[in-house]
């Protein structure tokens, strides 16, 4: 695999469709916690897995854990990137400040959507690692109804971004 994305379950996954909502609910009911996920990642890294690991999660989970403690634990166990769909670019400064304190911090992955044409240059300029391209609007898991201008959108976004 080129990358491993781990979806961190959340108690109120409003941006997700029924499948991911149910998966989050089931995971939480069975005792999955962020601490256990960190421990799992640490175990994977001890097995010499070098595939980049990225967390897909809601910002509330990060905030509740504590920004400094969260970033420190990401570094400690080997999390390479963070995809946080409910954290818009304009509200990333607090987390970015904590991430900037250590070169080993995970990369904050920028999300670009088909309706953000004016924002694409700014988002790409601030992107590190890769860009997460949202291909359909609304909640996740609602079928394969891609945005009508998907080809043009992907062509506009498809350019090299700076790696850390």
For every predicted segment, state its role.
Residues 1-8, 24-34:
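Active-site cofactor/substrate anionic-group-binding motifs, chiefly glycine-
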Residues 4-7, 74, 123, 157:
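Conserved, mostly hydrophobic/aromatic
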Residues 5, 83, 131-132:
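Conserved beta-strand positions in the central sheet of alpha/beta enzyme cores
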Residues 10-20, 32-44, 62-69, 84-103, ...:
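Active-site-adjacent beta->alpha loops and helix N-cap segments on the catalytic face
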Residues 18-27, 133:
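Short glycine/proline- and charge-enriched loop/turn segments
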Residues 48-58, 99-111, 158-164:
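Short beta-strand/loop segments at the ligand-binding rim of alpha/beta enzyme cores
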Residues 52-57, 131-138:
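Short beta-strands and strand-loop turn motifs
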């Amino acid at each position: 695999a080129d990358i491993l994305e781990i979806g961190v379950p959340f108690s109120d996954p409003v941006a997700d469709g029924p499948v991911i909502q149910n998966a989050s609910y089931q995971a939480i009911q069975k005792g999955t916690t962020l601490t256990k996920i960190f421990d799992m990642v640490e175990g994977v890294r001890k097995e010499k897995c070098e595939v980049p690991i990225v967390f897909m999660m809601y910002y509330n989970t990060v905030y509740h854990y504590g920004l400094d403690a969260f970033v420190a634990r990401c570094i400690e166990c080997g999390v390479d990137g963070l995809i946080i769909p409910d954290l818009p670019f304009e509200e990333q400064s607090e987390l970015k400040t904590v991430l900037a304190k250590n070169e080993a911090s995970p990369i904050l992955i920028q999300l670009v959507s088909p309706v953000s044409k004016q924002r694409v240059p700014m988002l790409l300029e601030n992107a590190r690692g890769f860009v997460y391209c949202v291909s359909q609007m609304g909640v996740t898991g609602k079928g394969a109804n891609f945005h009508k201008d998907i080809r043009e959108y992907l062509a506009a976004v498809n350019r090299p971004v700076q790696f850390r």
